[in-house]
A protein has these predicted regions:
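Long, low-complexity, charge-biased intrinsically disordered regions
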Residues: 1-173
Length: 173
């Protein structure tokens, strides 16, 4: 499954049809919300930003789990987006331009019908002091679902954060 036509539509909609592709969905050197850099003004920033983030959420949930983390971070700024957040969202479009051919593959002929779940957690990131859990589920070797969310309880160690994540993925399964 892929959404290359939808990605092409998004690139055209935001004037990025001929953009230079990038290799990562987020720039590791430019933290999200870096207000020290001057960005151009964007008319109707909030409405344009909300629309773009919604379109990126649609992609991340359906066929592009590789952009889930940055899209989740972008969505946390929906109430009051700055130009830097919009530029980060456009960076994701540059990434999608270079990875349009990525797809999810499902093997309907597989003899192995097993469900596998994997989980991981970050521990108390520097911005929110809350751990983030990530879960992925595979059926017959193909990704069928993925989740990334902040843990509701503050973990006292990375081990505790990972145990909480493992507990939650077990409950979902």
């Amino acid at each position: 499954m892929h959404q290359s036509e939808y990605i092409t539509f998004l690139l055209q909609e935001y004037g990025l049809s001929d953009c230079k592709p990038v290799r990562l969905p987020a720039d590791p050197k430019a933290p999200l919300g870096d207000l020290s850099v001057t960005y151009p003004d964007v008319p109707n920033l909030r409405s344009v930003y909300l629309k773009l983030v919604g379109e990126l959420i649609y992609l991340s949930v359906n066929t592009r789990p590789d952009i889930s983390d940055i899209v989740n971070a972008l969505a946390q700024h929906n109430a009051n987006p700055e130009a830097c957040h919009f530029m980060t969202a456009k960076h994701v479009l540059h990434y999608l331009a270079g990875t349009m051919d990525l797809c999810l593959c499902y093997d309907h002929d597989s003899d192995i019908h097993r469900l596998h779940a994997y989980t991981d957690a970050s521990w108390a990131n520097e911005t929110g002091h809350r751990s983030v859990s990530g879960y992925v589920w595979f059926y017959t070797g193909s990704l069928i679902s993925h989740v990334s969310k902040k843990q509701t309880t503050v973990a006292l160690s990375s081990t505790e954060a990972k145990y909480m994540a493992a507990t939650h993925v077990t409950c979902y399964t």
